[in-house]
Amino acid sequence: MMLRWSGVWGFHPPRIFPSLLVVVALVGLLPVLRSHGLQHSPTASTIRGSEPPRERSIGDVTTAPSEPLHRPDDHNLTNLIIEHGGKPSRKAFPVLDIDYPHVRTPFEISLWILLACLMKIGFHVIPTISSIVPESCLLIVVGLLVGGLIKGVGETPPFLQSDVFFLFLLPPIILDAGYFLPLRQFTENLGTILIFAVVGTLWNAFFLGGLLYAVCLVGGEQINNIGLLDTLLFGSIISAVDPVAVLAVFEEIHINELLHILVFGESLLNDAVTVVLYHLFEEFASYDSVGISDIFLGFLSFFVVALGGVFVGVVYGVIAAFTSRFTSHIRVIEPLFVFLYSYMAYLSAELFHLSGIMALIASGVVMRPYVEANISHKSHTTIKYFLKMWSSVSETLIFIFLGVSTVAGSHQWNWTFVISTLLFCLIARVLGVLVLTWFINKFRIVKLTPKDQFIIAYGGLRGAIAFSLGYLLDKKHFPMCDLFLTAIITVIFFTVFVQGMTIRPLVDLLAVKKKQETKRSINEEIHTQFLDHLLTGIEDICGHYGHHHWKDKLNRFNKKYVKKCLIAGERSKEPQLIAFYHKMEMKQAIELVESGGMGKIPSAVSTVSMQNIHPKAVTSDRILPALSKDKEEEIRKILRSNLQKTRQRLRSYNRHTLVADPYEEAWNQMLLRRQKARQLEQKITNYLTVPAHKLDSPTLSRARIGSDPLAYEPKADLPVITIDPASPQSPESVDLVNEELKGKVLGLNRGPRVTPEEEEEDEDGIIMIRSKEPSSPGTDDVFTPGSSDSPSSQRIQRCLSDPGPHPEPGEGEPFIPKGQ
């Protein structure tokens, strides 16, 4: 059988199963070792508590209730022997001593974490099982087996205490979800998420509580004593969707972003409703009568709990972002601030009975953009992987201890109550989703289809939050808490096992859109931002203040004030694309210096454009090509005359009062200047000829520039034209054949000879060279480039924006620009 497994699944069970058996055996035998008198450490009395054995958990340090063996003090023993006339015997030096109580708590915690990690490795080694059964189901099964093994050796299995769950296991999962929350999808669907989280949870709680109260009235003697407040409290516990269970299942099926954010966002934001309802009904259960003022205060406490948690999270997020400004010299502690401030936000919210989950989400969302702008790339990687590791281990321990606590807990079974609870949970979820979606689709542009509604209703999983809240119930006020806990475990197991295992085949069967694994391209990002600005402008014109309008307001406020306070240095002013371009240029310059080459130096135009964008940047550290002041000034003139400032949108439109555009006059003047420049260029190109001078200098053909110079090879019988940049506002720079050059052009051998080397070193310009041999009377001379005789040269400067004259049919080949 071992050989068959090794050949089929590609792994060797003997390599991993013995380790698992050793860990399980150690966990089971530790209580046995503890009961055999190994608690003789002096620290054992300080960590021993008085709680019953079933209260022990991974964070609880209580021991078995048996009386410890007290050793007499060595000094008293010596005095006793001396009083009876004996000599004290010398104690032998202990070569090996066992002091397990001294290390019991961290040792057991390490063993449980090691068991969780080995289980995750074992599940993913067997792809057949992991593709069919969700990981959460397998972990619960492992917990059931470990709990049964511990109970089989005669010991009480550890129980998942609520304080351990809420203070140590839940925060890492929520922080990981809040820090890496897809903010765009979350904000765009915030209204839908709030309706599902608030209205849907209230509907489920009261619908389930009311129907269960009716069932208790007719269900028999065992459940007749359950009152309305008891069933409403139970309904508020079991109605909330659990974020841990949703994350564990939805991350494996890779559902699309819309459905994932709707279900997961609902599970995050319904925490405030669950906390308020839980404390409200728990307080009402101890009252003799409940008045209208109590109900109003309970309704008011919902806003206090929700908004108070958000406020606490925002405050700690801002403090964390501000602190990260000053960590540039001590990069090692940067990740620690993220963890500490987030955890402090959660504990501060729990201190005032606010929503700790809302505080964690708010702190993670607020601090992330500013912290990542201040910290190094290595710190960002550390934060990412540590949060993922921490949340994964916590999630694994939660599901394992759900199974262990099921074996360890005391249960009370009632078929009527348990089956009714399970049935009413499913009915309430389906009805709530259908009714709320019908209302939501009236206001949504992208409607939720029936397939989407089915996945949302089917994805309402329950988990450890409901279990921990049920365990917190006081048996004095709620004598049926064991029955409630049994019903909660039944609902959790049904949703995790049945719904969790069947949701993947149903998604494939219904052909629900899956999540795209690839990241969006730069083109998609640019178009997305363009559409955001476009929709913001449309809302401004229409006078409609939608979420695009408020998003634009927040972005402006963020850039103007917040970034300057929370982001260090010039990074708060520099756009991301320009910063990335500057970083790449610096990297290329460093590589260029190290290699000793000159092939990667940025071009002159690129360098000058970047200097204009960053006027305060220090250019001494960058390797730039030498530019003469005249050429740089010439380029600046061209940019000033041809570039225009972007017009700003009007803030609002009113048919009675129109806001004047301050750039309108400058815009009209610029259009006039461009029109004059085009007319001047047209005149230049139309009359670009050399006038005839008797018989020796016939007229030249009209000069033209080819549209694609790289597509042609230079010909010997064509003149060569190069363009020297000049300002279009300076017509004096356009020097058409003046009187001094006429004589040089007409003379055959009077001009200086231009060698090819001098021609290459000379500045660019339109150079026309006349051939040596004169033509016969009545025919045109043809100017050829590169003549061996001493030709005459003539320069014509033209603006870079001039494309040259348009080709006319019937004329010769176009001139080829020089040097291209």
From Swiss-Prot:
Residues 688-691, 719-724 are annotated as: Interaction with PPP3CA. It catalyses: Na(+)(in) + H(+)(out) = Na(+)(out) + H(+)(in); Li(+)(out) + H(+)(in) = Li(+)(in) + H(+)(out); Li(+)(in) + Na(+)(out) = Li(+)(out) + Na(+)(in). The keyword Nucleus does not apply. It holds the Pfam family Na_H_Exchanger. The modification Phosphothreonine is found at T607, T755, T784. Predicted models used for more than 20 years predicted 10-12 transmembrane segments. More recently, the structure of SLC9A1 has been solved and reveals that SLC9A1 possesses 13 transmembrane regions. This is Sodium/hydrogen exchanger 1. The gene is Slc9a1.
